[in-house]
């Protein structure tokens, strides 16, 4: 590796000596480019030199003088004694904070800071003001890394450089050569001081081909030496994600925050520069160049400014635009700005290069199609990492009493939700955002967005998700309106569907006969069952609070309509019934659609149960996969109760005693028939309408006349009115051996 590094450094020096063709630019070249107007200036990109003011000219000149001083200045100087040094350093800081620095200026100042030409205090201040105006050249980073090899700078300067490199990672125009230095960065893990920041950088650089057995062993040795450090767990978790067979130690299934970014020196400053250059702020912001006390920058939220524009990583400024045919006939990558239509994506998919700022793909449906095709896990990891910073570090709307920017933030969340729906995958960073902000949520602001984020929580053990639901969401659920309760139940139904889709896909990818997967699948089924049971508990409490509301019961049965078909629709060995309170509330409901939906759910439960019993695999599987006899008895009880009530007019079990005085108070003596399909409270209007349709001249005909042939005609009438659930239930559960009710059913 040393030979490769020397060769690379010599090649870089040759490129520097070539002048205009080099990306590494000397101060003289930079000044010439500034005067010619063909390249970016130090302050900002300007299309016309004539429109610049005298103040801008003076600032540009002062910055050029300051950068020239640092490039050729004294090797050692003291800030307290050298006023010229302080003056030039202040100039660089002011320009960096107001408009950012051009790539050429960053290239020069990085070399100054890491070459050890000045003291630690000066080097630290230079690194803290390395805020890019647009992008950072990859060659500048490579040259800076080469200074680390000769050990010219102090340990504190190295730490600050790695922190800067992580913060500015998405601003680097190329990363191919930086990725080739993966081994060098990995070797730097030996330094205990650098280890957390190098782990963070490696987390951003790691791809599947970087995961090697010797690196896994090294990380495990470091963990044994240093303990369960979050940064080591992050890298090990990523390695296990790419190569699960190489790591057998137990790791946290999901840690909400691996890296602490709350003391990032450059994030808010670089964002403010970008917003100002885009016209979001009329005046420069006064931002400190030192760690803050944890308070985020209170700025106007603008989702269009937070998500950077889509720019190619390999775009060269001033390059003549080429046609699509030119890129297809060569090995060059197609600039993303030329990608406008889906046919172009299909034609150029082999020569497409994703942007360096990966978060910019959120605004591009075409690139989201591309991400879905390539299935590169590192892409989703980079997007999730950026979302983690954007949601956890910069979103302060939920902990301050200021909702003026709620609309802009809602638009941003809607965009994130649309991306998750398109990719059919939830981001862990969004779940971490829910854990952080849900305790402060009032249940009203961004309600739709919050509940949609809840529906996209990635699959995990229910014990990890339950605190989010029981500790924070349940109190809001119980104390809010019925409409909020219905919305939460809808979100839990979508969450269940997303989990089932993920599990069914994963189960088909790997064979279910291997013992390790059986254990995993058994735990997964347990998590799904616990989610259904917890939702059932919420439903029972909500029914009591809302006095068995029909609207609420509709949403509850919609949820169990999804539950009853799990085995057939998703091929997962699980059958979970609704609680008795839900069953009896639906059976005795005054709404005919509720009764019809209950009949359909019971019919689907029967089909799933029958299919599960016929499955040979379940019969030979371990006990954790066998269908519970308790569930079987419970289903038979529900089935018997429905048939007895709706068909045989025997709603009570033998041996059940009811006080006759209580029956008399109900106003009816034929209590046994009060719940059949003729006298059921939800079907009385249909029975009366049927009699009027059959015998319009006899206005006094009694409901008891519906028997014999009329009974069958009445059933056909109900089926014609849309009671398909009732039709399926009767045809599947009621047989000819069951006697039809006679005129006197007492």
Swiss-Prot record:
Species this chain originates from: Mus musculus (Mouse)
GO biological process entries: centromere complex assembly; chromosome segregation
Region (Disordered): 1-24
Principal localisation: nucleus
Source organism phylogeny: Eukaryota, Metazoa, Chordata, Craniata, Vertebrata
Cellular compartment(s): Nucleus; Chromosome, Centromere
Family: Belongs to the CENP-I/CTF3 family.
GO cellular component entries: inner kinetochore; nuclear body; nucleus
InterPro entries, A to Z: CENP-I (IPR012485)
Gene: Cenpi
Subunit structure as annotated in this protein's UniProt entry: Component of the CENPA-CAD complex, composed of CENPI, CENPK, CENPL, CENPO, CENPP, CENPQ, CENPR and CENPS. The CENPA-CAD complex interacts with the CENPA-NAC complex, at least composed of CENPA, CENPC, CENPH, CENPM, CENPN, CENPT and CENPU. Interacts with SENP6.
Designated name of the protein: Centromere protein I
